[in-house]
């Protein structure tokens, strides 16, 4: 990124249309393209920015940067090693997308038609908003959620870039579901697999009973719910969901037998999704740790066993 997302580096394997806010490389001067992609991620791009009202990268300054690169064969081995980690992360992400779609399909087949359901109710019958508090000192960048580090399109979350300056924030527990309450059309949702905390811009839905956890998440994950939330939101520039209106969302009240049958399928799926995300975090840490060490030669790529 030249402006806006300054310093973010992307690798395009297919044809693309670059905007004038980007810098792109076409000629690699005999170097391995994938290696250069990883190498560029190690540069301190902030030192190349111009001191203007809208900071941007000065390409002339970048061109003058003196760098040292290994031979082409070493480049290929380094790129291959790092690519293996990225491919595994990509595969896990695709698996999780399929598992989430499968879970939603099963939910819709069993409980999607609330009009025909024998037992009908509203969202407040199966959950409430968390009123618990947790000390910020007990949280970290992995266990704190805000609208900034929750991803749109139901894609989960990333690590937080900072923690709140307040002493306490909303406490969330295993089995709760988090939804960003700002611009709900972005569909930011996270299933809590452990104790955590969230900002005031995030709604923490706590199931009325623990065995409602998977059912609650599946209910809130549905596009139909987000459409309902958007319809009741207030504000134009930065709309927020109406907490009272949200709790009137119509739901099916499953029998104990129906709920048990659903949990038999849903709980293992959610556990697998969590396991894959946890593995992705470990792989990302490993990749980001190896990246500068491989580039600098501190670690010989031949010594890396994956």
Over which residues does each language-model region extend?
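A short beta-sheet element
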Residues: 1-41, 50-53, 58-59, 169-170, ...
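Sequence-specific dsDNA recognition surfaces
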Residues: 10-13, 17-24, 124-135, 139-174, ...
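Proline-centric
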Residues: 22-30, 46, 60-86, 203-213, ...
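Structured core elements
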Residues: 24, 66, 177-179, 204, ...
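A short secondary-structure junction motif
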Residues: 43, 47, 152-154, 223, ...
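Non-catalytic DNA-recognition/assembly elements of restriction-modification systems
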Residues: 64-136, 150, 256-302
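Amphipathic heptad-repeat alpha-helical coiled-coil/stalk segments that mediate oligomerization
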Residues: 305-306
């Amino acid at each position: 990124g030249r402006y806006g997302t300054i310093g973010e580096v992307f690798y395009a394997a297919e044809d693309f249309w670059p905007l004038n806010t980007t810098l792109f490389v076409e000629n690699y001067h005999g170097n391995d393209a994938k290696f250069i992609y990883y190498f560029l991620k190690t540069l301190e791009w902030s030192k190349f920015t111009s001191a203007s009202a809208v900071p941007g990268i000065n390409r002339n300054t970048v061109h003058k940067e003196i760098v040292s690169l290994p031979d082409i064969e070493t480049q290929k081995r380094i790129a291959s090693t790092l690519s293996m980690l990225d491919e595994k992360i990509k595969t896990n992400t695709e698996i999780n997308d399929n598992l989430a779609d499968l879970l939603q399909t099963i939910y819709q087949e069993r409980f999607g038609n609330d009009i025909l359901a024998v037992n009908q109710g509203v969202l407040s019958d199966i959950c409430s908003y968390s009123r618990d508090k947790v000390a910020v000192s007990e949280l970290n960048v992995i266990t704190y959620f805000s609208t900034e580090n929750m991803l749109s399109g139901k894609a989960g979350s990333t690590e937080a870039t900072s923690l709140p300056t307040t002493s306490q924030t909303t406490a969330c527990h295993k089995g709760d579901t988090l939804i960003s309450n700002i611009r709900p059309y972005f569909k930011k949702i996270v299933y809590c697999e452990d104790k955590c905390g969230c900002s005031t811009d995030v709604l923490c839905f706590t199931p009325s009973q623990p065995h409602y956890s998977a059912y609650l998440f599946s209910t809130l994950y549905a596009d139909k719910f987000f459409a309902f939330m958007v319809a009741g939101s207030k504000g134009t520039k930065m709309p927020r969901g109406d907490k009272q209106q949200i709790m009137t969302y119509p739901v099916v009240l499953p029998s104990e037998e129906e709920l048990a049958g659903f949990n038999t399928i849903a709980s293992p799926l959610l556990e697998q999704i969590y396991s894959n995300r946890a593995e992705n975090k470990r792989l990302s840490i490993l990749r980001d740790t190896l990246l500068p060490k491989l580039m600098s030669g501190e670690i010989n790529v031949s010594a890396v066993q994956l």
